């Protein structure tokens, strides 16, 4: 008991501030989420593509980019010319013009300034080149680094972030978002830039802090119950053997301790990242199986010869599914053309990719689905869920717009 009391007391002294921060910052996050660029805003910031000027075939570009290394391919307009954007496993990005195959030069301040002036009607206050800052520290931005941060002289004090590789808008924040997120997500996730830019270190720090928090709370609940039983045995009707603040700490701990433990455990599990449980992220082998081969091999079959003309076409994305390239067209505000994903086609591709498992169920993920909301965030509307009969009771989630293999969770833990 003395050892447990010592641990609870001093872990509480060290972690008490973190508990308070996690709770209060979590309340802020309920109302102000971390800044994220909306898809329609991203598309609006792009320029129209001159599809007639696309003269370099995709197989030529893919060969030049590296057929075995490329993981994604799309077309946008850069400098009023169509350009291929190649993504790699290493999170690198390469841009080449689609009219002659030459590399797109890195963007400079002048080109970014001209683009902002053309796409916004707001005056510019400042432009600077940044490698990392608080709102672009996530690893999903690595391919676009360094970025140009453009500060607008508007009432919202808007900051725009543009890739130095492609010139695309990749992030947008306002003064209100930044203020509340310093009190919310930055505190809640222990997200200072100097720590978060080292993902593995940040992940380890948060995981162990949460584990020690669980230990502190569990010991506290146990000690609280033990003291409660002792005093009830000695004095009928008494709730606590302590006085003053210790008494209130004991009584409140008895009622709220289990809630605190479940709260800390749930946060700790969200940071597991494969330590104790499987992750829902598909492996490269699983992605390749759904694609019907490597992305480079499948997408090299793409042809733009019959590509319809759209006056406001902003982006062409190429995906791979079941050995066939899939072309998805997006306009200024929305996806305007995508092939229809037939149930029989899904079943055939999944059966081929997972020959040792049978398909038990095929369904459309409903809005507000429990496991989707807790484990994977929000999936696109109309996402298909395929349930397999393997030992892990695997589910596959496939986006019906892009045919992208989104997640692959096994037995659910909520």
Language-model segment annotations:
Residues 91-95, 101-104, 155-160, 168-170, ...:
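Short loop/beta submotifs within extracellular cysteine-rich repeat domains
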Residues 32-110:
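Juxtamembrane extramembrane loops of integral membrane proteins
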Residues 11, 82-88, 96, 148-150, ...:
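Short, structured motif recognition centered on aromatic/hydrophobic residues
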Residues 137-219:
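Hydrophobic alpha-helical segments
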Residues 260-368:
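Juxtamembrane segments of multi-pass membrane proteins
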Residues 1-42, 195, 199-283:
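Internal alpha-helical transmembrane segments
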Residues 404-413:
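Conserved small/polar residues in nucleotide/adenosyl-binding loops
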Residues 80-84, 90-145, 320-382:
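Membrane-proximal low-complexity regions enriched in glycine and acidic/polar residues
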